[in-house]
């Protein structure tokens, strides 16, 4: 394997000049720089990353932790983050915690020992446990929270306006004539709590009764939980005519359950998701509350870059606005359609 001395010998220059080119230091002529770059290419020279980090006091490496790579929301956000850091010549290391504290600790320690200069974390349960927080704070590197709802006061964060997004979704269903609206979400989830807040506020704003028996929480936000919870809701009386789901993945499970029961969508039941990760790739296409995933990733990466460049201000929390995307999985409630057909005023609010 070629060394920096081999590059210097091939270029006919000093080791100091080669080092200056590698570290983007000023004072090297364009002719000398081209000689060094040509020698590097001919020798396939690859600088020792650790040595460079020590000499420059910088590794140009950041880390990002997500709770799941199966949930399509997170890969889309990761791509946005990675694009920003690539443009700024940083390497992005990705860790999948699976929502587990031990995995979070392993990745934090590994990334920091591997010279990560900063971290982006999701504001999910495992990242806010005492031992994890202690490791993050003792690391003395900038940390930015992204998505999730468990804001950590010491760190910058980019979060969605979950209550408003849920309010808009449920209010839309109410305007379609739905009175019995179910909700499926996740136990011990702060995001579920905030989306339930918006759900309840919309019902209150319309003067409708909150029916706790139509609210069901599962153990995870996976498709299987959406399927199981929807099956259970179908046995409730009154049976809901619309269902608001914690995310699109759970909504896919709900769609499967309804198809299995031969319940027509949206004629007999409307389905509405949240995050807009799968809305265009199912049948019928899913009405969903879209989160600006690319924007969220860009903002989080930009916040971290600012900290890496020395920005020293109090932690900043940026709240992004969701947007309701109307597709084919929602429609008027049956009684609402009958009133419209008769030419009567069907508005509830």
Cite the ranges covered by each PLM segment.
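Hinge/beta->alpha junction and helix N-cap segments in small-molecule ligand-binding domains
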Residues: 67-76, 94-103, 148, 157-168, ...
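Short acidic capping loops at alpha-helix termini that bridge into adjacent secondary structure
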Residues: 179-180, 210-214, 264-271
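Alpha-helical recognition/docking segments in bacterial nutrient-uptake
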Residues: 60-171, 175, 235, 349
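Short helix-capping segments at alpha-helix termini
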Residues: 87-88, 139, 204-210, 235-239, ...
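N-terminal helix-turn-helix DNA-binding module of bacterial transcription factors
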Residues: 1-60, 348-349
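Flexible loop/turn connectors
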Residues: 229-349
